[in-house]
Regions:
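N-terminal secretory signal peptides
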Residues: 1-16
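N-terminal export signals
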Residues: 11-14, 20-40
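NAD(P)-binding Rossmann-fold cofactor-contacting core
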Residues: 74-91
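Core domains of carbohydrate- and sulfate-ester-processing enzymes
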Residues: 196-239, 462-464
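Rossmann-like dinucleotide-binding domain that binds NAD(P)(H)
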Residues: 223-315, 326-329, 335
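NAD(P)-dinucleotide binding in Rossmann-like oxidoreductases
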Residues: 295-297, 308-399
Length: 471
């Protein structure tokens, strides 16, 4: 029931007319400008719907092939795997098909108004930057990128191009999410000193890379699937992005993009990235990871990552702790805070609200949020029984996560998950993936984008692209 209720907040509604956008295209310099190139504006005059290109039609891409056509034109479908989502190609027969998003942008640049990226993690950055360079607003699925450098590059390019952006952490649009944000900022929980976020999956902890597995099938463009990653012979095992650091981010990208979202935004942690102190004293975020063992190829079976956040934006210091897998002591700690047992494990009928979630602990009360942060409960329940939790009372409600971005594409306000915010959240999380590759703690300067105390860790903030690929 919680999941069905949460999905209601993501529903699409009738959009603003494109002609209305064009009539009001000259808005203030402080707003987010979009569709700024003449090619996009030219195609925008044709009708009231935006022409959307989708890069990645399987997985999360399936959602967009069903929802976007309700309000917009889905004019291009791009995927390196021809077997993905065949039903979409039948339903959207007028959409042009591509394997290479660069070719798509070259061939259809004048016809495309905006781009959605739903590829594996390691190609989020290259696909998104290609679209931004082409003057197209971008909606990129979470995690924003695989590395911290890629994330920062996306933020800076989106600012330079003055384009509407959003990351796909859908809980941001939920009424309860925005209500919880109000309660935290209004002091209903008192002073927040600790936040716990979790997922019970853990990592694969693979010790050896896959060996050559024969030729790639003809329906898959293996070279394009690899994208910016170093070339290696085909093996389908590489395509499970949750197994390998070179291609994925595991649960810190997959789930913590959701579970950390409410506390990170409500406590304005992004200010450490976006609003540097006028005194010039750079903030330092300290992060320490415990784990089942260092694994630079894959991800540890379990991990506990602790970020120490300094005072900022009117909030005092706060500690975020990520619990992933069967980390010693984590389940007992979390069940004590939640006040009941958590349904962890592999059984198919487990409660989805238990295996991932967030606990925000204040001096006067606690918030237990579900995995997407789309619903929550206040604890102790008797203390807060008269507090409504379903809709915001002060901040603006959302018309739907994708809809907020589409309205920004038409000149509306920036989406809450725009790349300014999404970069900060993603850097924060990917710093955790760097920390799990070491035993010692790290000191990160979010303004300079630098690990101050560990040269090897600092080198992992970026990655080398193979020839022919760049941001």
């Amino acid at each position: 029931m919680l999941w069905r209720c949460a999905l209601q907040h993501f529903s699409f509604v009738k959009t603003l007319s494109r002609r209305g956008f064009l009539r009001n295209a000259a808005f203030s310099a402080g707003s987010v400008l979009i569709l700024s190139n003449s090619a996009s504006l030219g195609s925008a005059q044709a009708n009231d719907k935006l022409n959307i290109a989708l890069v990645g039609v399987g997985g999360r891409g399936e959602w967009f092939t069903s929802t976007i056509p309700r309000t917009e034109n889905l004019v291009a479908l791009c995927d390196v795997d021809e077997t993905k989502n065949p039903d979409a190609y039948e339903r959207l027969s007028k959409a042009r098909r591509f394997r290479d998003f660069r070719r798509m942008l070259d061939d259809m640049g004048r016809e495309i108004d905006a781009v959605i990226v739903a590829t594996p993690d390691h190609t989020h950055a290259v696909a998104s930057t290609a679209a931004l360079h082409a003057g197209k607003p971008v909606f990129c699925e979470k995690p924003l990128t695989r590395t911290i450098h890629e994330s920062r590059a996306l933020r800076e390019l989106a600012r330079k191009q003055k384009l509407a952006t959003s990351m796909g952490n859908q809980g941001t649009a939920a009424g309860p999410f925005r209500r919880a944000l109000e309660l935290i900022r209004n002091g209903a929980l008192g002073e927040i000193k600790e936040v716990h976020i979790w997922n019970d999956s853990g990592g694969a902890d693979r010790k050896q890379p896959p060996v050559a597995g024969g030729s790639a099938p003809e329906w898959l463009d293996w070279d394009l699937w690899l994208g910016p990653a170093a070339y290696r012979p085909y093996n389908k095992e590489w395509m499970n992005r949750h197994l390998w650091r070179e291609f994925g981010t595991n649960q810190l990208g997959n789930w913590a993009s959701h579970t950390a979202n409410l506390a990170f935004m409500a406590l304005k942690v992004q200010d450490l990235w976006l609003n540097a102190s006028p005194s010039g004293n750079a903030p330092v975020i300290r992060v320490q990871a415990k784990h089942s063992g260092v694994n630079k190829l894959s991800f540890p079976k379990w991990e506990v990552v602790e970020w120490s956040i300094p005072a900022h934006a009117g909030f005092g210091p706060v500690t975020f702790t990520w619990h992933n897998g069967r980390a010693p002591g984590s389940r007992d700690l979390l069940e004590g805070l939640v006040g009941e047992g958590l349904d962890w494990g592999d059984k198919k009928d487990r409660k989805w609200a238990d295996f991932a979630g967030a606990m925000i602990v204040g001096s006067k009360g606690r918030i237990h949020a579900t995995g997407h942060n789309a619903t929550f409960r206040l604890l102790p329940e008797d203390q807060f029984k008269d507090v409504q939790t379903g809709r915001p009372e002060q901040v603006e409600p959302s018309k739907g996560h994708e809809m907020d971005w589409l309205q920004a594409c038409r000149g509306g306000p920036p989406a809450w998950a725009n790349f300014d915010y999404a970069d900060a959240l993603n850097e924060f999380l990917m710093l955790g993936n760097v920390a799990t590759q070491f035993e010692s703690g790290l000191e990160y300067d979010p303004v300079a984008m630098k690990v101050r105390n560990h040269r090897e860790a600092d080198a992992l903030l970026s990655c080398e692209y193979r020839k022919g690929w760049s941001l």
